[in-house]
């Protein structure tokens, strides 16, 4: 399955929720998911638009067979009861992700690899400033996060070269990289998006608010601070995109690109 963001945005997607809070999140997701249909519980406030349902179990079968992607905003247990009985095989089941109503977590629930739920979870999490929860073993074993900052309009090939050369010089294998991470101010940098796509590595954005809130012992970039009010991009993004991280490669600058590497302690 094509894991490119553009493919996710154009895929037929069902957005489902049981609550007003969930409906507000659905509205936010509509801006990035073009080919979507909204399903709202009958008790959701009438100001929200969407097809209404009384019982999720009554419509889950049709949704499961009709959509490539399913985003359910509500309790994971409800999603499991509604869709779990319908699962057949990872090569044909739709991608299902679950989001809590406060947008803290986006869980890749079904068809993580073949169905694209892992990629979908990251796209949704980036947009909602949430934490993607991906438990497939291949991804879980990866322990490196590459933080990247770049000058505006830098070509993807330059970013790819900066990442690959940094990892090579440090004797680090690309297969260990779980995320390429950057600050949310870089979301529209096509060179960065294309570089991550070329390398086949998920691109994770860290909120500027989170970067300014945390204090770590890394070198402050005067340029980044003067332009964006941030202490840096590459190092804090690498650290904050993971859990129990330590910076193992301090930032390195090359041709308008800054790269840093953090390692997660997974033991």
Locations of regions flagged by a protein language model:
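Short, structured coil segments at secondary-structure junctions
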Residues: 128, 198-199, 243
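Short N-terminal or domain-adjacent regulatory/targeting segments
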Residues: 1-9, 157-163
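Conserved mixed alpha/beta catalytic, RNA-binding, or beta-rich assembly cores of soluble enzyme
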Residues: 18-191, 256-267
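General small-molecule cofactor/ligand-binding pocket signal
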Residues: 39, 133, 202-206, 248
């Amino acid at each position: 399955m094509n894991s490119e963001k553009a493919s996710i945005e154009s895929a037929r997607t069902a957005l489902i929720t049981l609550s007003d809070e969930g409906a507000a999140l659905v509205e936010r997701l509509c801006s990035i998911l073009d080919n979507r249909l909204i399903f709202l519980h009958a008790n959701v406030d009438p100001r929200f638009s969407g097809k209404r349902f009384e019982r999720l179990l009554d419509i889950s079968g049709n949704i499961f067979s009709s959509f490539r992607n399913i985003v359910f905003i509500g309790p994971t247990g409800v999603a499991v009861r509604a869709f779990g009985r319908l699962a057949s095989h990872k090569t044909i089941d739709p991608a299902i992700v679950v989001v809590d109503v406060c947008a803290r977590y986006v869980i890749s629930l079904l068809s993580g690899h073949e169905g694209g739920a892992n990629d979908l979870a990251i796209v949704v999490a980036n947009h909602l400033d949430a934490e993607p929860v991906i438990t497939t073993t291949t991804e879980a074993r990866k322990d490196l996060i590459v933080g990247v900052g770049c000058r505006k309009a830098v070509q993807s090939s330059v970013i790819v070269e900066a990442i690959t050369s940094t990892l090579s010089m440090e004797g680090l294998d690309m297969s260990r990289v779980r995320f390429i991470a950057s600050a949310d101010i870089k979301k529209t940098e096509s060179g960065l998006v294309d570089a991550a796509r070329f390398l086949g590595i998920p691109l994770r954005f860290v909120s500027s608010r989170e970067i300014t809130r945390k204090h770590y012992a890394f070198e402050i970039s005067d340029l980044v601070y003067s332009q964006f009010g941030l202490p840096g991009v590459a190092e804090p993004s690498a650290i904050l995109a993971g859990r129990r991280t330590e910076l193992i490669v301090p930032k390195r600058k090359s041709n308008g690109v800054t790269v840093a590497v953090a390692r997660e302690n997974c033991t």
